[in-house]
Amino acid sequence: MMFLTQLVSALFLFFLGPISYGKPVETFVLPLAQDAPIPPSEDPFYQPPPGYEETEPGTVLRQRRPPFPISLFRSAPIDLAATYQVLYRSSDTFGQPTATVSTILIPHNANMSKVLSYQVVEDAAFINCAPSYALQLHSDPGGLFGTIIIQSELLLITAALENGWVVTIPDYEGPAAAFLAYWRAGYATLDGIRATLASSGFTGVDPDAAVGLWGTSGGSVASAFAADLHPKYAPELNIVGAALGGVVPSITTALHSLNKGFDAGIIVSGVIGLSKEYTYMQPILESYLVPHLRDKFMSAGKKCSGAVSLDFRMEDIFSYFKGGEESGLFADPRVKAILDHNAMPQGVPEIPILILKSVNDEISPISDTDALVEKYCSNGVTIDYKRDLLSVHTILAVTGAPEAVLWLRDRLDGITVEKGCKTSTIFMTLLQPGALEVMSKTIIDNLLNLLGKPVGPRLRTEIVHVPPL
């Protein structure tokens, strides 16, 4: 088995294309004997070249084929027509130059004029949890069940690939894993789309492709910020719609919902992530941490979300701070300002938006999303808001996926949506017209993908050229 693993690794590395800085081409060599991908914290591919700061946002700084194949649950490679990773120039929260990576998945029989930007639920303050790494065969999960959510999301992503769409997956938290820094996430998402469209010379993606946005939970907020920032930051992009599931408009409200729950660790990762973006928060955090609890708290910065959730499950996170809930870290006006800066909305989208939300959402109360929709609608945004009576936050990510796929399919097919706002309270999103059919097909496709079926529609949706390996 080890020999087979090394043989597969060697073949992938042999066919790995040169890595370019734009003009001069640098050959990127990895050791053939490695049996797992190098994590981002150690991989030189993730380090931008000198002078990158002078390039425009969305510029491709470097490109490669992933060292290891994209795989279901880190163990079962899926058969794609091609996969690329691009390091590209972006902007941080404060508009300063930064660089991050997006992974571009091209299905068999792809329609290169349709692109989906999928924002995963990373929810971690550790760079080695980034999807560009986590989705590769034999990646380290960053603790027990660390990247299990990202692994599971590949099952949803394949539903998009089976429609023939090119899927780009940005590492929207950036090189420091600034979880909850959603301005950065929005910029990284938009610049990831720019980079994907600019990759046409080596990927074959149509530079004028129509683009959809999709994300659930934390990924939905990154997608929403991209929609908010799109009109001013990247108005040239032909984004045709955004599907948001389980959106979390207010971090402050979510803190109280998460505390003492199974996912209380999200609070810990969020605090560490924000302190990486807003560096002046670091000494503030240190001043509030209870000394004998500090090491455990900060250990979350070296683990991925599933492992952090296990470490802090059912704990009172406010007790980690001097002053507790009443006068601790989150009562500090400097920290409250940071949380408010990353609340929604932060702009007025010009694209139609589908919002799916559980009435019984245990992480972010439905009232927050009701208020968000009201703000959007009062500013003329076209919204289709569906309130699901039966689901909870996590379940909606699965049961709402078929509705998101159907809605995005119409947008990418050029079917216009009626302007204005529409709110409906439904029994279950999965019972919407066509949803069960999509769910059934997705389950069957994923089972067949595990058996080696080429990922993509059976009939070619457009004659395209995918550069050979």
UniProtKB/Swiss-Prot annotation:
Its EC number is 3.1.1.3. Pfam families: LIP. It comes from the Eukaryota. InterPro entries: AB_hydrolase_fold, Lipase_secreted. Keywords: Disulfide bond, Glycoprotein, Hydrolase, Lipid degradation, Lipid metabolism, Secreted, Signal, Virulence. The active site is at S217, D361, H393. Belongs to the AB hydrolase superfamily. Lipase family. Class Lip subfamily. This is Lipase A.
